[in-house]
Structure formats: C-alpha cells, structure tokens
C-alpha cells in the first residue's frame, strides 16, 4: 500500500503536536508519605488521559481513597463507555495497610486525545 502525501501534509504529520512523548513525561508519578497516609499522585499532561479501570496494584487488594481527581465518562473507540481521568489523579492508602507488603507496584494505562494509546505501564512504588 502506497499513499501519496503532499509536502504540507508531511509537515503536519511530523509536527511537534504529533510527537509521541514517553509515558513518564505524560503521566508523571509522585509519591508522598507521612506517618498515617501514603499518597500516589499522577500529574497528567494536557491532551492526555488515564483509564480509571486500568489502575491496579500487584499483590495488594486493600481499599484506597481517591483524592483531588476529576473523573469523567468517555466514549472510547475500543472499550466503549469508560471512566477517564485528566490533569490530576491522586490516591491515598493508610500506612498501616502497607506494613505487611514487601513491595508495591501499580499499573496504569492512558492515551493521547490524538488517538495514541500507551501500553500498560508498571511503576514500582515501594
């Protein structure tokens, strides 16, 4: 399959707005803790979103609390109606719930509004 592309189309296709950024730059993870709580915060770059259902912990099943997050419904081409998060997603876990955990790994997935979706990303927290 060969497609003809004129020079103005090439310029648009290779422009900075179509650049695929590393997931770490798009979904920046920050960890904060004190004696009572442990918080994980994602700063999500403008023009991107994370799937709420994609956020899972390996070997950890206790509840966590969602803070400072704007969750909205989204009609996804592949997943249908789903919940997504834009800008900030923050969760809080009680420190005492982590005492019996050897390590904490969280996984998540998100996409750009231009249509590029990142593979599931795993991030070691502890």
Write out the residue ranges for each language-model feature.
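Structural recognition of alpha-helix starts/caps
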Residues: 1-126
């Amino acid at each position: 399959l060969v497609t003809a592309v004129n020079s103005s189309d090439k310029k648009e296709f290779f422009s900075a707005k179509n650049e695929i950024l590393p997931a770490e730059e798009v979904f920046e993870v920050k960890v904060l803790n004190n004696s009572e709580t442990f918080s994980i915060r994602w700063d999500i770059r403008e023009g991107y979103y994370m799937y709420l259902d994609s956020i899972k912990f390996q070997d950890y099943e206790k509840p966590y609390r969602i803070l400072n997050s704007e969750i909205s419904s989204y009609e996804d081409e592949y997943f249908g109606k789903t919940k997504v998060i834009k800008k900030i997603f923050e969760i809080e876990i009680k420190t005492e719930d982590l005492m019996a955990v050897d390590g904490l790994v969280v996984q998540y997935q998100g996409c750009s509004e231009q249509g590029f979706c990142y593979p599931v990303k795993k991030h070691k927290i502890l």
